[in-house]
Amino acid sequence: MIMAALPFKLFASIQYLLPQHGLSRFVHWAVRIRQPWFKNALIRAFCRFYRVDLAESVCSSPESFECFNAFFTRALKPGVRSVCSEPDAIACPADGMISQLGAIKGTRLFQAKGRCFELAELLGGDRSRTEAFENGSFVTVYLSPRDYHRVHMPVAGTLAAMTHVPGALFSVNVATTENVPNLFARNERLICYFDTAGGPMAVILVGAIFVSSIETVWHGEVTPPRSKTIRRWDYSGQGLRFERGAEIGRFNMGSTVIVLFGPGHARWRAGIGAGMSVKMGLSLGSCR
């Protein structure tokens, strides 16, 4: 991979020079090309390079997908992911790797290697929402290119609101988390707020350089078009309830999911920590 061939600081520095949004617009177009020779070759090359196993997918061959984006956001066969069944369990929202997990120290979340970022900046400056999660808990799950890219509910809850925060599109990996300050609070992100039996919860889908769009099951594609201002939606009173493990959104190309809980509600399981590979539905802890 390119990142492996470059020192981490150099790789991160190059990110500042790239036309991030232009590249994402190009990817949005390219991954929707339906010419069989093009999309089949692209899917095969991607599977070889990233060692993608299609055995778990509903569609198991490149020819079965209408375009590369359909492959990237592929559905899994029923039963290949089991969702934890303990009454108070927190289910992992996605396949990937735990980047960080722990407590929100006042208003600060740990990013990597001594770097932290502010909760208020992550939430787009929404003071009332910020207060609900101060001294709470968080988990950050990184989705690699080979992973299943649909996002699911960690605990049962009712959708309260959604916020889209425009921003940069740095790639998300070890190099950038260690070297780009406030990475998750400066990248484009979609924040979904839920009311749960264990208090407020936020599920945040963080964009990256080749994340051509983010969508939810209740709204559809949120980006593009990309806005230069923060957009907010109020869903209170609409009764949009989702059970634990239900699909709520997806990355069209992938990145990172951050889940926030209010103070005193989440307790992480022993043995769950940064660097651990996880599958959607795995119990990460409990929420009361």
Curated annotation (Swiss-Prot):
Write one Gene Ontology MF term.
phosphatidylserine decarboxylase activity
**Class of the enzyme per the UniProt entry, highest EC level:** lyase
* Xref: InterPro entries: PS_Dcarbxylase, PSD-B, PSD_type1_pro
Mind telling me which Pfam families this protein's record contains?
PS_Dcarbxylase (PF02666)
Pathway the protein contributes to: Phospholipid metabolism; phosphatidylethanolamine biosynthesis; phosphatidylethanolamine from CDP-diacylglycerol: step 2/2
Name the domain of life: Bacteria
The entry's active site is D95, H152, S255
- Give the way it sits in the membrane: Peripheral membrane protein
- Claim: Cell wall biogenesis/degradation is one of the keywords in the record: no
Q: How is it modified after translation?
A: Is synthesized initially as an inactive proenzyme. Formation of the active enzyme involves a self-maturation process in which the active site pyruvoyl group is generated from an internal serine residue via an autocatalytic post-translational modification. Two non-identical subunits are generated from the proenzyme in this reaction, and the pyruvate is formed at the N-terminus of the alpha chain, which is derived from the carboxyl end of the proenzyme.
Requisite cofactors? pyruvate
Q: Where is this site: Cleavage (non-hydrolytic)?
A: G254, S255
GO BP annotations listed: phosphatidylethanolamine biosynthetic process
* Residues with Pyruvic acid (Ser) modification: S255
List localization entries: Cell membrane
Keywords, comma-separated and alphabetical: Cell membrane, Decarboxylase, Lipid biosynthesis, Lipid metabolism, Lyase, Membrane, Phospholipid biosynthesis, Phospholipid metabolism, Pyruvate, Zymogen
GO CC list: plasma membrane
Cofactor stoichiometry and binding? Answer: Binds 1 pyruvoyl group covalently per subunit.
UniProt lists the family membership as follows: Belongs to the phosphatidylserine decarboxylase family. PSD-B subfamily. Prokaryotic type I sub-subfamily.
Q: Which HAMAP family match?
A: PS_decarb_PSD_B_type1
Its biological purpose is as follows: Catalyzes the formation of phosphatidylethanolamine (PtdEtn) from phosphatidylserine (PtdSer).
Q: What is this protein called?
A: Phosphatidylserine decarboxylase proenzyme
Lineage start: Bacteria, Pseudomonadati, Pseudomonadota, Gammaproteobacteria, Methylococcales
